[in-house]
Design a protein with these regions (language model features):
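Noncatalytic, beta-rich nucleic-acid-contacting surfaces in large DNA/RNA-processing enzymes
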Residues: 1-273
Length: 276
């Protein structure tokens, strides 16, 4: 369901950014910074950088990705530092998009061989992200990517522990074919009517399907082994917790863990809060 493998990665897992990754094909860290900057700007990617890349005019490394790059690029071209800074500030605040370049700016850029596509790209931008923020976001994403690649079971266990409220138990234990069938059903419902609940369920199913397709398995709920709300790695697989059952609340799931895993006496339904 994805060409990027970035499901579950902050800043990189949304439909919008996954589409950017497919279009731009970043190959190194600096190009991923470009993706981070482009995804947080306004009118920086859509109808701007995406068209430049698609037409072959320039690459992901060359488009305007972060606000800082405008000033640095213009300085390399030989513009006066004050003018380079002022142009950057005007572009990143959307002032150029709204009212055009100040007198003399465009002429100076052309005199210093700034290409037409770059000047026109500046005209479209309404907001630009600072490079420092883009790097900070990307560093967090890279750390999680590393775990997803080299410690996948741990990654999925932690992901679902933190964001597993909408997990589909039947899909998790049923295998990739069941997960895909459930995904298709949710997508069908979303085409008919958008709603936040189904969108969250779809994200969860995408992670479930990805994990299964990669060859990793979920273990079903088992008394004495499952936790209340924590997914745990067991023999290279991910053990589902009690809370993965629909309708079983957190308090009841924790009570079941205490009763079955920690040796507490399992007396009656009331002690597990299952009848609350």
């Amino acid at each position: 369901d994805s060409q990027t493998g970035t499901f579950g990665i902050p800043e990189m897992g949304t439909n919008f950014v996954r589409g950017m990754l497919v279009e731009a094909r970043p190959k190194n860290f600096s190009e991923l910074i470009q993706i981070s900057g482009l995804s947080h700007g306004t009118d920086v990617w859509t109808g701007n950088a995406d068209e430049l890349i698609r037409s072959g005019t320039c690459t992901i490394a060359e488009v305007i990705g972060c606000r800082d790059s405008i000033m640095l690029y213009l300085l390399r071209k030989g513009l006066e530092p004050k003018m380079a800074f002022d142009i950057m500030e005007a572009v990143r605040k959307g002032k150029v998009a709204k009212g055009g370049f100040a007198p003399g700016w465009e002429e100076a850029m052309r005199e210093h061989d700034v290409p037409d596509w770059y000047i026109e790209s500046c005209r479209k931008i309404k907001y630009m992200f600072p490079k420092a923020h883009a790097v900070a976001y990307l560093m967090s994403a890279i750390r999680l990517m590393w775990f997803k690649l080299y410690h996948p079971q741990a990654f999925y266990a932690v992901y679902f522990t933190v964001r597993g409220d909408d997990i589909d138990y039947e899909a998790a234990v049923g295998g990739a074919a069941v997960a895909r069938a459930h995904m298709n059903e949710v997508k069908r419902r979303l085409k008919e009517e958008k709603n936040a609940k189904d969108e969250d369920v779809l994200v969860s199913l995408q992670l479930v399907n990805e994990m299964l397709v990669r060859g990793y398995e979920f273990l079903p709920i088992e008394l004495g082994k499952s936790r209340g709300s924590k997914y745990v790695v067991e023999d290279g697989k991910v053990r589902l917790p009690f809370c993965s059952l629909k309708g079983l609340g957190g308090a009841a799931a924790d009570a079941l863990e205490n009763a079955t895993l920690h040796g507490q006496e399992y007396q009656d339904r009331k002690s597990t809060r299952l009848n609350s």
